[in-house]
Regions:
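A generic "structured core" feature
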Residues: 1, 5-7, 117, 121, ...
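Mid-to-C-terminal alpha-helical segments outside catalytic/metal-binding sites
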Residues: 1, 25-43, 218-220, 234-275
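Hydrophobic faces of well-ordered beta-strands that scaffold small-molecule active sites
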Residues: 1-5, 44-47, 71-74, 99-101, ...
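An N-terminally biased module of ancient metal coordination in phosphate/nucleic-acid-related enzymes
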Residues: 1-54
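Conserved, mostly hydrophobic/aromatic
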Residues: 4, 36, 59, 91, ...
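Histidine/acidic-residue-rich catalytic or RNA/ligand-binding cores of hydrolases
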Residues: 12-15, 144-145, 167-172, 198-207, ...
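Active-site gating/metal-coordination segments in enzymes
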Residues: 53-139, 146-148, 187-196, 274
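Catalytic pocket-lining loop regions of alpha/beta-barrel enzymes
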Residues: 112-223
Length: 275
């Protein structure tokens, strides 16, 4: 299962938010489905990209096209007056199973982690069995484990916690992430190694981080293609090469099955696949 991809456009049908930090080329559902077919991937999770803000229409249209194949992670306002409980229920019926909170690209970073807003969102989605997906640099939060140890929902951290390889695995924030994994509080997406190291494939600087999250809790790991790889300034490898990279980083077949099949079925509420 591909647990991290975005659909963007066509912009004529799904226009981007005026306040955005980049403008992606169209990355349509049809193009993504062609990629899934090429990779022989049957299920996928579509994550709301920041260029759409809280307008989830493009993602929801993709979910509607094949409810058996797709799940979604939405972005909503933290104000309960803006999004009603019925609207949350409608998102659930459409296939949404989590909310994304982008801490990296917020306009004002001086206020620190918006913990009260995150907790309010978590309390609202807890009855639905959803999770919060956090895009944040965990190295900026040395008290990460203490902050989230009693959060009411599971947390999903993208891009190995989005900590650059130069910080090393002993970084306090990354160690906090490992602690949350060990205590069944956090999941980690094994995505975007090219975003957090300076080298090219096979991203050897990221191998210690990969090994650390596997050791912490292999049942809390999921994988994603990160398609269409927005805002990546270095040369991108072929998506099939990223799949092959997982084979080398998780060499045990039962471990790969957990990462690619069993774990995401649990997190995203997919029916278990028959063996």
């Amino acid at each position: 299962m591909d647990c991290h991809a975005h659909v963007c456009g066509p912009a004529t049908l799904f226009p981007y938010a005026k306040e955005r930090i980049y403008t992606p080329p169209d990355a349509t559902l049809e193009s993504y489905q062609a990629l899934l077919k090429m990779l022989r991937v049957n299920r996928a999770v579509l994550v709301q990209p920041s260029v759409y803000g809280t307008d989830n229409r493009a993602m929801l249209a993709a979910l509607k096209s094949n409810p058996q194949q797709f799940r979604g992670v939405a972005v909503i306002s933290s104000d309960p007056k803006v999004v009603s409980d019925q609207e949350l229920a409608d998102l659930h019926a459409a296939g949404v199973r989590g909310l994304r909170c982008n801490i990296v690209d917020i306009a004002d970073k001086s206020a620190g982690l918006p913990i009260d807003q995150l907790r309010n969102l978590a309390n609202r989605i807890q009855p639905l069995g959803w999770h919060l997906e956090l895009l944040m640099h965990v190295n900026e939060y040395p008290n990460l484990a203490k902050t989230f140890e009693e959060f009411p929902v599971d947390l999903v951290f993208g891009h190995f916690g989005y900590v650059h390889a130069k910080h090393g695995i002993d970084d306090k924030g990354f160690q906090g992430l490992l602690e949350l994994m060990k205590n069944q509080r956090a999941w980690v997406k094994m995505t975007g190694p090219y975003r957090i190291c300076d080298g090219d494939l096979p991203y050897v600087d990221m191998r210690p981080f990969n090994d650390a999250v596997i050791e912490a809790n292999p049942n809390r790991l999921i994988w994603g293609s990160d398609w269409p790889h927005v805002m990546v300034k270095k040369q991108m490898p072929h998506d099939a090469d990223l799949c092959d990279l997982l084979d080398s980083w998780a060499q045990d077949s039962s471990l790969r099955n957990s990462i690619l099949v069993d774990n995401p079925c649990i997190l995203y509420d997919f029916p278990a696949l028959k063996s």
